[in-house]
Amino acid sequence: MDHALFRNLFGGFMNVRTLRSYQLLPSYEVLELPTNIIHAPPPNRFRRKPLQFAARILSSPLLRRALTIAILLPILYVLSGGIPPTYSDIHQFETNLPQHRTSGVDRRYLRFEGTLWGLGLNNILQEQLLLSYIAYASNRSFVFSDYTWSQLPLPYTLYDGALRPTHMPLNTFISAPTAGGDMPSIALTQDVFDEASMSGGPSPHDIRAVHLSHFDSVCPTSARVRLSSAAEERLSDDSLDGAELLNTWVEWLNNASDDPCLVVDFADKPVFNHLLFGSERVISMYPLLASTPILRDFKWSSLVQSAVDRNMEEIEKSADAAADVIPGLVAVHLRRGDYDGHCRYLAKWAIPYQGMNRFPGIVDTLDPEDFDHETESESAQLDHYLRHCLPDITQIVDRLREVRDESPELNLEKVYLLSNGDEWWLNELWEELEKDGWSPVEEGMTSSQDLDITNEEQYISGAIDMAIAEQAEVFIGNGFSSLSGNIIMFRMAKGVPVGSNRLL
């Protein structure tokens, strides 16, 4: 082998010059051997000089290249998914909300701490809607903050091998009263305040929500009155139905303090969590929310709405502007991915449908108590759950056909698939749907995967899907999903008949 090549390849492991420069040993003839010889083991160079040996290993060009590649490959893979946007313009929008410019000496605020984070949008949204209702009913301004996926003090975190924003402004998703939006249903809009200011007349009491940064500026820590959700047992009484629980909270807050800067901490006792939203207790909450601006004035953010308008601009809407539905369209929610394990967990513990998915008037039901555990095997129960939670292609096609046949007067012929499923699976499903007579909502747009969205819109694609599903003549949801439950709630709040909501 060429000497230069040998040195480049193995120079870090062996110094070639040391093989040539060792000293000559003395002749055995001049040595006087000892009478009692102890045979010692040969010296171990690595044991004597481990740091030197390690340094030689690490100085190898080949090893350095391998380490560099090993470090760069995962970084390049993560970066290939793109750098998430900062949404700085929306942060600025929230900072400059007009209600932040008015001092309002009689204004009272309600801030909740220890709330949910690290969960999907719809889990967070369920909680935020209820908390903003409590603030509204208590005649206080709700204090909202960012949607938080991670508490890391960094702009991004890793999720599924890609970068994801740790925080996002709530107004990337919604521009409703919960996120500081106007309340036109009770004439609480910026136009009303501007007119009052110009005329010199009295302004209405402003209870529009404010951002946390504004609350921090007007309510220093020393001025805040702090309460705990664990202060009274009735605040988390499981025997109360949803409406009674909300009324209990409003009554407690009204009696607790008149101070303008009120903070409630959920750290010691979570109340509005998955256990509540998974139960039928939330059904009695709906009329309260629907009668207030919290739902009556709910709307998606301009970022969500612009994506919907761009993707649906060629689609004809119903003549009924109030309902704003797309005639003949069925939107179906097909959750995949982590639901493979989640659905098996639901079957194992016989979990019922989510609360809002059990709303009276939804004809499709699942009652775990209907199972006879003595005569039906665990595999039979699992199969039944999977049919409704994680149906295969044949089961989906059959279910859509059933819904179409049950409502011939609606002329259901178009389908939109809300799904996080793999593209190959969605393509196979669509081939079977076409054979069964279905057409896409728009040419070339069959599912979430076909949406034309920007980098900013990519991280709110679930909300875009929900806004599209709200406009479907019929929605088929997943009974175990909070996303499906929220779609049903928003559809009902818009005046869409409850019977137009079906389940897999």
Swiss-Prot record:
GO terms for biological process: fucose metabolic process. Pfam families: O-FucT (PF10250). GO terms for molecular function: glycosyltransferase activity. Part of the gene cluster that mediates the biosynthesis of strobilurin A, an antifungal polyketide that contains a key beta-methoxyacrylate toxophore that targets the complex III of the mitochondrial electron transport chain. Strobilurin biosynthesis begins with construction of benzoyl CoA by step-wise elimination of ammonia from phenylalanine by the phenylalanine ammonia-lyase str11, oxygenation by str8 and retro-Claisen reaction to form benzoic acid, which is activated to its CoA thiolester benzoyl CoA by the dedicated CoA ligase str10. The structure of strobilurin A was used for the development of the major class of beta-methoxyacrylate agricultural fungicides since its beta-methoxyacrylate toxophore targets the Qo site of complex III of the mitochondrial electron transport chain and prevents adenosine triphosphate synthesis. Compounds such as azoxystrobin (Syngenta) and Kresoxim methyl (BASF) are among the most widely used fungicides worldwide. This class of antifungals are used as effective treatments against a broad range of destructive fungal plant pathogens and make significant contributions to food security. InterPro entries: GDP-Fuc_O-FucTrfase. This is Strobilurin A biosynthesis cluster protein l1. Glycans are attached at N139, N255. It is a single-pass membrane protein. It is found in: Membrane. Pathway: Mycotoxin biosynthesis. The chain crosses the membrane at residues 66-86. The keyword Transcription does not apply. Keywords: Carbohydrate metabolism, Fucose metabolism, Glycoprotein, Glycosyltransferase, Membrane, Transferase, Transmembrane, Transmembrane helix. One of its GO terms (cellular component) is membrane.
